[in-house]
């Protein structure tokens, strides 16, 4: 499933150019740069997941099943149980620290499931890069929180939850195919939220005109 990944590779190249060898993913740099790096990583992860979701759907899910599955219990996302904003107005009402806390909770919920994706997808971009970029982004969010909270190191997590692992053998199990389909859908939704929250922060702090993210 290698189609549709050009934009993901482009974002990966940008990140590589911005992270010289031997340096931490998020060194001691200005707030604007920290936030810009976090947005780029969130964009990259969201794009790779969206491409993978589309390719998986085309490969494993019959067309007559796709829309019905999107409304089924299999598509329920754990992230819907936390008080994270789901629309633009609510997002703008939250503080920057709140948006970072929501983002951190969403990212951490995928750390374990993503590691099992190496067995499901031979795509090297997905298998090797997403977990590392999640870890980089987690580190970046902690750096942003320390920057915004006068260097305090707190337990910023909202809830401790994680998604189930992906089924590594969807070819032989229809339930497994649907489970993976649902998990990828949730992953895509959650990363879209994280990207949106970070873009709102960036817009509020560093864009002079009205923020319309």
Swiss-Prot record:
Disulfide bonds join 77-186, 203-211. One of its GO terms (biological process) is positive regulation of receptor signaling pathway via JAK-STAT. Its main location: secreted. It is found in: Secreted. One of its GO terms (molecular function) is growth hormone receptor binding. Keywords: Disulfide bond, Hormone, Secreted, Signal. GO terms for cellular component: extracellular space. It holds the Pfam family Hormone_1. It comes from the Eukaryota. Residues 1-25 form the signal peptide. Growth hormone plays an important role in growth control. Belongs to the somatotropin/prolactin family. This is Somatotropin. The lineage of its organism: Eukaryota, Metazoa, Chordata, Craniata, Vertebrata.
């Amino acid at each position: 499933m290698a189609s549709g990944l050009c934009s993901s590779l482009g974002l990966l190249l940008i990140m590589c150019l911005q992270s010289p060898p031997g340096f931490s993913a998020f060194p001691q740099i200005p707030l604007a740069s920290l936030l810009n790096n976090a947005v780029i990583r969130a964009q990259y992860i969201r794009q790779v997941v969206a491409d993978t979701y589309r390719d998986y759907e085309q490969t494993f899910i019959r067309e007559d099943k796709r829309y019905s599955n999107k409304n089924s219990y299999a598509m329920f996302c754990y992230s819907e149980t936390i008080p994270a904003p789901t629309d633009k107005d609510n997002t703008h009402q939250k503080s920057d620290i709140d948006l970072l806390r929501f983002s951190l909770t969403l990212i951490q919920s995928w750390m374990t499931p993503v590691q099992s994706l190496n067995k499901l997808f031979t795509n090297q971009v997905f298998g090797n890069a997403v977990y590392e970029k999640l870890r980089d982004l987690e580190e970046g969010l902690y750096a942003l929180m320390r920057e915004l909270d006068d260097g305090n190191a707190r337990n910023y997590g909202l809830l401790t939850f994680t998604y189930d692992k992906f089924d590594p053998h969807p070819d032989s199990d229809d339930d497994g195919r649907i489970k993976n389909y649902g998990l990828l859908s949730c992953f895509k939704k959650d990363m879209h939220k994280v990207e949106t929250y970070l873009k709102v922060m960036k817009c509020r702090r560093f864009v002079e005109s009205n923020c319309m993210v």
